[in-house]
Amino acid sequence: MTFKTPDLCDEFESELGKTVRVVTPMFQRYGGRTSFSGQIVTLKIFEDNSLVREVFGEDGKGKVLVIDGGGSLRCALVGDQLAILANKNGWEGVVVYGCIRDSGDINGIDIGVRALNTHPQKTLKKGVGDKNVAVTFGGVTFNPGEYLYADEDGVLVSGKALT
């Protein structure tokens, strides 16, 4: 599926700010895919990526994981091993409101990644967090089951499939 977020904004202009929302530009681009899209699965965690491994262990075909890591810049929520697992299980991409690590390796993996930045330190492993709850960051609420579109120009969230 090919798309451009500017074209989607133009095509669905009357729905902008309603069913189609533009995420505040704040993310760095990583991973081997410059663009990705899919149905949203969410995690709300803080400096503990135990649930990320669990979710990436599931079938991710046609899905994007949105991680609300509280915007923490103190550790990385996704590293190369989790990106490899996500790719193996068919995930389209991941948006991390937090940091990743092993960015050089992740850039060679066929998965789309957006994150605030990088950090070399791993997280705690306590198994704490929530799955498939509405999360809000970047001026947008991400609801499980909605759709996310990301490319070089930005990230969009929509209540319905746009392509």
From Swiss-Prot:
<dbReference type="GO" id="GO:0051252">
    <property type="term" value="P:regulation of RNA metabolic process"/>
</dbReference>
<feature type="binding site">
    <location>
        <position position="102"/>
    </location>
    <ligand>
        <name>a divalent metal cation</name>
    </ligand>
</feature>
<dbReference type="Pfam" id="PF03737">
    <property type="entry name" value="RraA-like"/>
</dbReference>
<comment type="similarity">
    <text>Belongs to the class II aldolase/RraA-like family.</text>
</comment>
<dbReference type="GO" id="GO:0046872">
    <property type="term" value="F:metal ion binding"/>
</dbReference>
<dbReference type="InterPro" id="IPR010203">
    <property type="entry name" value="RraA"/>
</dbReference>
<feature type="binding site">
    <location>
        <begin position="79"/>
        <end position="82"/>
    </location>
    <ligand>
        <name>substrate</name>
    </ligand>
</feature>
<dbReference type="GO" id="GO:0008948">
    <property type="term" value="F:oxaloacetate decarboxylase activity"/>
</dbReference>
<keyword id="KW-0456">Lyase</keyword>
<dbReference type="InterPro" id="IPR005493">
    <property type="entry name" value="RraA/RraA-like"/>
</dbReference>
<keyword id="KW-0479">Metal-binding</keyword>
<feature type="binding site">
    <location>
        <position position="101"/>
    </location>
    <ligand>
        <name>substrate</name>
    </ligand>
</feature>
<dbReference type="GO" id="GO:0008428">
    <property type="term" value="F:ribonuclease inhibitor activity"/>
</dbReference>
<protein>
    <recommendedName>
        <fullName>Putative 4-hydroxy-4-methyl-2-oxoglutarate aldolase</fullName>
        <ecNumber>4.1.3.17</ecNumber>
        <ecNumber>4.1.1.112</ecNumber>
    </recommendedName>
</protein>
<dbReference type="InterPro" id="IPR036704">
    <property type="entry name" value="RraA/RraA-like_sf"/>
</dbReference>
<comment type="function">
    <text>Catalyzes the aldol cleavage of 4-hydroxy-4-methyl-2-oxoglutarate (HMG) into 2 molecules of pyruvate. Also contains a secondary oxaloacetate (OAA) decarboxylase activity due to the common pyruvate enolate transition state formed following C-C bond cleavage in the retro-aldol and decarboxylation reactions.</text>
</comment>
<dbReference type="GO" id="GO:0047443">
    <property type="term" value="F:4-hydroxy-4-methyl-2-oxoglutarate aldolase activity"/>
</dbReference>
<comment type="subunit">
    <text>Homotrimer.</text>
</comment>
